[in-house]
Design a protein with these regions (language model features):
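A sequence/structural signal of beta-propeller blade repeats
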Residues: 1-141, 156
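C-terminal closing repeat unit and adjoining cap/tail of repeat-based domains
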Residues: 42, 147-268
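Short, surface-exposed loop/helix-turn segments at secondary-structure junctions
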Residues: 142-146
């Protein structure tokens, strides 16, 4: 089993269930290790108390950290032969594995906040940035209403990564500094997105007729930092289907979630 570097600096002891979310938040592989393809596969993981990035190649004995301009990464994806990651502020980087380093390629979208969960997903050849806004007592300051859930999802916004043709111009350094920029996406068309603790996935609804709805975002409760502390209003209940056309949310699971330490995930 591969070992990570020590990322846990605590002076007191914690119960296992209270720190379970601090080990590996998410892991993405460059290809299926079982595929008969030349070249070794690579896996990149978000791990540790500060959610930093590390990678391992096929045959490695230890993980290697990827130097990054920030920490607290929300998601990572393998897209067009490279690994991309987004931090809690919405800044996107591309990771180099052969000579471990990272480069910022796109700024944080206007209006984003570190309290908004970010996801990266490839959909129809495009790289999308999905922002998930939460409400509830935990995220809306000044609210002290025991009836209101601790947290719940209010909605999503979708942006597409596009090449910035004005990059390098001196008229507005802040605007043209990065090689890529964000374009708003108002419709997913035939696609449905599946977001959560697992790697994000985009599927065609017409290819799986009757199984799920097009132009929708299916999401699970992946708020690990607060998942364990209050079963009512959290802990597996913040799940649903967001319609990008109507901006409405409907439930997809109404049963009782039974695991106190393991957030739900998609099995696709």
């Amino acid at each position: 089993m591969l070992g990570f570097s020590d990322q846990y600096n605590y002076d007191e002891e914690f119960k296992p269930e209270s720190v379970a979310h601090m080990f590996v938040t998410k892991a993405v592989v460059s290809r299926n290790p079982r595929d008969d393809v030349k070249g070794k596969w690579v896996i990149v993981a978000i791990y540790g108390q500060f959610r930093i990035l590390g990678f391992a190649r096929e045959g490695d004995k230890v993980w290697t950290d990827i130097p990054c301009p920030s920490r607290c990464y929300d998601d990572v994806v393998f897209y067009e032969g490279k690994f991309y990651a987004v931090d809690c502020h919405g800044i996107v980087i591309v990771c180099e594995i052969d000579d471990p380093k990272s480069t910022v390629i796109a700024p944080a979208p206007v209006g984003t906040r570190d309290t908004i969960q970010k996801y990266l997903v490839e959909s129809s050849g495009d790289l999308l940035l999905i922002s998930r806004e939460r409400g509830g007592r935990l995220f809306e300051g000044g609210i002290d209403d025991e009836i209101l859930p601790r947290y719940y999802t209010k909605g999503f916004s979708v942006l597409k990564l596009e090449k910035n043709n004005n990059a390098g111009e001196e008229e507005d350094e802040a605007k043209y500094e990065y090689p890529f920029c964000w374009i708003e996406v108002k419709s997913l068309g035939d696609r449905a997105l599946f977001l959560g603790r697992n790697p994000s996935v985009s599927l065609s609804a017409s290819e799986f007729e009757g199984l799920f709805k097009p132009n929708c975002i299916y999401f699970t409760d992946d708020n690990e930092e607060n998942f364990y502390f209050e079963p009512r209003g959290g802990g597996g209940l913040d799940m649903g289907i967001f319609n990008t056309e109507t901006s409405t949310i409907e439930p997809h699971f109404t049963g009782e979630y039974r695991s106190p330490i393991s957030p739900p995930f998609w099995y696709l």
